[in-house]
């Protein structure tokens, strides 16, 4: 499956929620959408990992010139390796972990009379309790794709902004494009 659409999000998260006020880390996150599969990943981390691998192949372990940032702890792939399955890849220190599970769709409550505009699209608000957090998502029915960042899927339009009730995680769309050259 090749990606046809790319949504770029500003991702913000708290590394240590016990420290107040919160200290946020941010990064450019991407959601690539294909016919069947989607991927959600930290763009800076992807570039950094690729450069590190290339340098390591040549025996060059000087990583001082690598881009800064790119610390979102995981990448998520829906309907990969097969329909109905997902993979979450997570790096902890120098160890990589892979978790394969069934795709779950959150049970969303649509909030009437809610409205905002995100990257030029009229959006409505929804709420769910999912994976131990209360999540809010602004979705655009004008973009009829039930996709969103991470596992926040299943709304009647593309999720352009999502955040948890405690404001420990947030993803806000800052751009959207159609990919002319399919991206695996």
Predicted feature residues:
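Structural motif
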Residues: 118-119, 130
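Extracellular or lumenal secretory-pathway regions
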Residues: 1-116, 122, 135-136, 167-184
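Gly/Pro-enriched, hydrophobic low-complexity segments
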Residues: 124-183
